[in-house]
């Protein structure tokens, strides 16, 4: 059963990534159609831009348990100073292992934005949106880093997304506008960006906080409570029992309290068995019913059309008659005649006749 599941996952994954870019991390990978988007402002039609994709598991990255949890953090570095600014943090808990997709149909989702950031910029991997910018401006150009940390892993995977913003200049080309690009974005690795950010000025550590903002960005501990972080404010999109979001379908959200998150016991039966066992039992019951019906129909047809079998014993007795039996019969008849001759019938005396 496990081999069949792996084969199906591989086929589905191959179909999904045929026309996509894959950035493989240590514990999870990123699948996007493009890691860079360009915006022309002012925008004519749509009032937002986004990079679509999803987080996936490749090969040995697939979690071994039935459920997993993790934390995502979206960072932003502008194209001038390359100072990191944490934008959003998302916490996923109770995520089932469904094929190769990561963080879909999770039982709990909790999202926060930093106080010094804007809600216009966000990420929602469970909805297939890796980066979304509403009402983009020239200051939104730069490099965005998505940090992903699974609870069962010891390191954080980082994926880079780029945004170019162009403005209409005073000179016009044949189409009526000329595009002016901000500073060029060369290929920056996650490690290089981190090293650059260490030289930037960081905000002062709030009172009562044991770590700085930058240390918090680089140290995403799975067991660390994000609700008490002084830089975070909770988003409205915090949900419970969140299902897979599809484009064009309105999703309802419900607030939840992560303190009431139940712990999963190791003795609990796997969720796959809870699905497979009823299916197998139903198939066996249906098969047994079909067999019983077939046997009943066959018996009824046999009773309606019985097979005639002659009594061969009587015929054999008649055919096997020998001349000896005829001789004995004749002797008995002769003896009976002799007895009648020797003993004539008695005369009947009528008492009324003298």
UniProtKB/Swiss-Prot annotation:
Bilayer-crossing regions: 296-312
Top-level taxonomic group: Viruses
Keywords: Glycoprotein, Host cell junction, Host cell membrane, Host Golgi apparatus, Host membrane, Host-virus interaction, Membrane, Phosphoprotein, Signal, Transmembrane, Transmembrane helix, Viral envelope protein, Viral immunoevasion, Virion
Annotated protein name in UniProt: Envelope glycoprotein I
Result of altering residue 338 to A: No effect on phosphorylation
One cellular component term from this protein's GO annotations in UniProt: host cell junction
Family to which the UniProt record says this protein belongs: Belongs to the alphaherpesvirinae glycoprotein I family.
Membrane-side (Intravirion) residue stretches: 313-354
Its biological purpose: In epithelial cells, the heterodimer gE/gI is required for the cell-to-cell spread of the virus, by sorting nascent virions to cell junctions. Once the virus reaches the cell junctions, virus particles can spread to adjacent cells extremely rapidly through interactions with cellular receptors that accumulate at these junctions. Implicated in basolateral spread in polarized cells. In neuronal cells, gE/gI is essential for the anterograde spread of the infection throughout the host nervous system.
Keyword Membrane (UniProt): yes
Sequence ranges on the Virion surface membrane side: 18-295
InterPro entries associated with the record: Herpes_gI
Record bears the keyword Membrane: yes
Outcome of mutating residue 345 to A: Decrease in phosphorylation
Localization, UniProt: Virion membrane; Host cell membrane; Host cell junction; Host Golgi apparatus membrane
Mode of membrane association: Single-pass membrane protein; Single-pass type I membrane protein
Subunit structure: Interacts with gE; this interaction enhances the Fc receptor function of gE.
Signal peptide: 1-17
Modified residues (Phosphoserine): 343
Annotated glycan sites: 33, 47, 67, 116
Broad class of where this protein is predominantly found: virion
